[in-house]
From Swiss-Prot:
UniProt GO MF annotations: diarylpropane peroxidase activity; heme binding; metal ion binding
pH dependence: Optimum pH is 3.
Catalytic activities: 1-(3,4-dimethoxyphenyl)-2-(2-methoxyphenoxy)propane-1,3-diol + H2O2 = 3,4-dimethoxybenzaldehyde + guaiacol + glycolaldehyde + H2O; 2 (3,4-dimethoxyphenyl)methanol + H2O2 = 2 (3,4-dimethoxyphenyl)methanol radical + 2 H2O
Keywords: Calcium, Cleavage on pair of basic residues, Disulfide bond, Glycoprotein, Heme, Hydrogen peroxide, Iron, Lignin degradation, Metal-binding, Oxidoreductase, Peroxidase, Signal, Zymogen
Pathway(s) of this molecule: Secondary metabolite metabolism; lignin degradation
Protein name: Ligninase H8
GO biological process, one term: lignin catabolic process
Disulfide bonds: 31-43, 42-313, 62-148, 277-345
Database matches in InterPro entries: Ccp1-like, Haem_peroxidase, Haem_peroxidase_sf, Ligninase, Ligninase_C, Peroxidases_AS, Peroxidases_heam-ligand_BS
Cited Pfam families: peroxidase (PF00141), Peroxidase_ext (PF11895)
Pro-peptide positions on chain: 22-28
Reported function: Depolymerization of lignin. Catalyzes the C(alpha)-C(beta) cleavage of the propyl side chains of lignin.
The record's free-text note on cofactor binding: Binds 2 calcium ions per subunit.
Species this protein is from: Phanerodontia chrysosporium
Amino acid sequence: MAFKQLFAAISLALLLSAANAAAVIEKRATCSNGKTVGDASCCAWFDVLDDIQQNLFHGGQCGAEAHESIRLVFHDSIAISPAMEAQGKFGGGGADGSIMIFDDIETAFHPNIGLDEIVKLQKPFVQKHGVTPGDFIAFAGRVALSNCPGAPQMNFFTGRAPATQPAPDGLVPEPFHTVDQIINRVNDAGEFDELELVWMLSAHSVAAVNDVDPTVQGLPFDSTPGIFDSQFFVETQLRGTAFPGSGGNQGEVESPLPGEIRIQSDHTIARDSRTACEWQSFVNNQSKLVDDFQFIFLALTQLGQDPNAMTDCSDVIPQSKPIPGNLPFSFFPAGKTIKDVEQACAETPFPTLTTLPGPETSVQRIPPPPGA
């Protein structure tokens, strides 16, 4: 059975289970901290949670380590190729933790440059708590998201066996790849289509770049990198005017705001006829953003796994934080209006947004970790 068909079946089963919950007496295990879970094996993850919130995410911040932990999930998970397997070659294990187990190999791959730092930070937690690297990467990414206001409530399943060999190079999309290349890559990895590719890129709402422009570090993709909102989908459609640093770097195009970076792949996917309307659909539509990202993130972290053999430990993931009440879901940054939009969707008009008051928006870099 193809992965997406299997995943859809599991998702339906989960929905039916939830619908019948009122009629079923659920057996739950009580952990030593007094909290209850659906499976006793999940209790151990509360210790992991407390440890990483304090010692990796610095008290639950949506900062540099959170951003890189989310990035690590994608780079570990997408490294799987059924097409290579059909040719008799090893195509990677997907969400199996190979990027941590074989970090000396995989973090040297060009698209993974910079991930060696977060792998180095995460490894001691894996060793301390005796969990598998694949499960830990998936868990840390979800906890990181829970620290970012506006993020969906994430499901978490355990059961990823340790990888036995590194993923091959060339399976992680690059900022300079064409839209065709990236669509083909995600389709090979999990039969994801062009719309689901856009859903994946919602992660850039809480992300920054350290390795595209060597002259500047911690450059965000939008003006609200600490909030999981649709602002990324607004600002990628604004006309680029300048580079935040040296410019002329492979995979970089001009951005609309000082201090903000725009990678070529985001720019082209936002303007491609196959993806532009889905891209625009997230503008000022937080509920769609949350629902679609929740689905695609779970699907990604089960690539290469049998969902039927995994244990649901979603009870351990903290409740997501709401977006601050003083901020709209989407807006034009100060100094920008509808006239700055390079609209590519021909089907529907661009949503009506307000412009924030004040001088032109200048985006601040993501601060380094405390003590760095």
